Regions:
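C-terminal functional extensions of proteins
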Residues: 2-3, 17-104, 109-197
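Extended, H/D-rich, highly charged conserved domains that either
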Residues: 5-7
């Protein structure tokens, strides 16, 4: 996801395809060019700081201080400088975050989604001391991945069979609507006519 997201930020394409589904000239190599731009910067955070990566998931993670763990696979291109290529070290890094999770959205990476699901606690304790299932959503275009996650013991997972791009677009739309509604309700007109926040 990170490479495709960064390619979209830098070149406006994903695997060389534009948002309207058209192939771009030399598009088959754009993901490698994106990786190389980040490698030249030194890290994803530095690529954001230098204005190379200007929007997208990874940009938002860096700007808002959201931790992320990128682990490799045997067929990785690149990889990006932030990718942990040692499988055991990658699992350890993932475990440090999954134990603190209050919600998980697993998107379009079968092996990583299943591995993460296996590390997640089934239940979490809220601030008020109540116990609840950990909200877990698995998004993939393959029903196999969604089913496999539940079959491997992540019983609390809710599966969404769709492509990741559509899911992310819809998720963003609803999050933005929710934020707009909260902003609107936070602005109240005081009896004197003054606006308070």
């Amino acid at each position: 996801v990170a490479v495709h997201d960064i390619e979209a930020s830098i070149f406006g394409t994903t695997l060389g395809m534009t948002g309207s589904g058209e192939a771009s000239a030399g598009g088959h190599g754009l993901h490698m060019r994106a990786i190389n731009k980040v490698r030249a910067a030194g890290s994803i955070a530095k690529a954001v700081e230098q204005g190379i990566v200007t929007h997208g998931i990874m940009h938002a993670c860096v700007v808002h201080g959201v931790p992320f763990v990128l682990t490799g696979s045997i067929r990785d291109d690149g990889p990006l400088p932030d990718v942990i290529t040692d499988a055991v070290a990658g699992q350890d890094a993932m475990k440090r975050h999954t134990t603190k999770a209050t919600m998980a959205i697993l998107i379009a990476t079968a092996l990583h989604a299943i591995a993460t699901g296996n590390m997640l606690p089934a239940f979490v304790t809220d601030a008020d001391g109540s116990l609840r299932e950990l909200a877990t959503i698995c998004v993939d275009s393959s029903e196999f991945v969604v089913s496999k996650l539940k079959d491997r013991g992540t019983h609390q997972a809710f599966g969404v069979v769709t492509n990741a791009q559509d899911f992310m677009h819809i998720l963003r739309l609803y999050v933005e609507r929710e934020l707009d509604a909260r902003r609107s309700s936070a602005i109240a007109v005081a009896p004197s006519g003054a606006v308070s926040r």
